[in-house]
Amino acid sequence: KRMIMTRKNLILLLFSLLTLNSCNKHEGPELRFCENYIQNYCQGDLVLLSRSPDRPPQIPADPQTPIRNFWIELTDCEWISPESDPQEFERLAIRNGDVGYNRWLEFWEYPSAFADNFQTMHITSNADWDEEHPAGTLLDDILWAEFWSYADYIRSGYETGGGNNVQMLVEDLKADDMQMIRDYVIIYFTKTPTIDPIHTLTVEWTTVEGEVKTASLTCRPQVNAKE
């Protein structure tokens, strides 16, 4: 009888634990009911990385190493969330029209974005790229931008699938394309330099408020370089 009671108690204990885990899954910190889709905004200084942020070293010591693309990120990022800065978070959410999501989100899928929205991007080099692109002239027509934007999804009333992958030449980017951007941008080279092989590239990214954010990277651009 004692053995039977022990087994029964064990079964009840296991059932209670399963029930408790189920409740935690819906009520715990890993799942939260969110009024806003974007849950984290990043505010910081612009930085250019020659490798993916997930693949160190991010900036090789040797600029002779050929690269086929570079990443635009923020360094010393200050994360703005409903917990860290409720007032600023609310201001950004209202600015973006992101105030009616009202759905459950798991912690690992919380969307993050640049705190700034942008109106123009321009990229130059300190060296001669080719005959059409001497030092100091815009390279916007030979650089390809790729990034994720949440703007269409939010503006559609959260009906279009989570956002859209923006892919176009830098010269074709408009202000509407550079709103509510996920927290990095990748720039690909579409031409390998034919004059000077080493370039210090400078990105000038202007916010909708008119602030110009700049960053530079010395590198060896090469279209067919290994990732």
Q: Where in the sequence are the language-model features?
A:
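C-terminal motif of bacterial Sec signal peptides marking the signal peptidase cleavage site
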Residues: 20-22
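Short, Lys/Arg-enriched N-terminal segments with co-localized hydrophobic residues
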Residues: 1-4
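Non-catalytic macromolecular-recognition regions in eukaryotic signaling proteins
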Residues: 24-227
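Elongated, non-catalytic scaffold/linker segments and compositionally distinctive motifs
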Residues: 6-8
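Sec-dependent N-terminal signal peptides
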Residues: 10-18
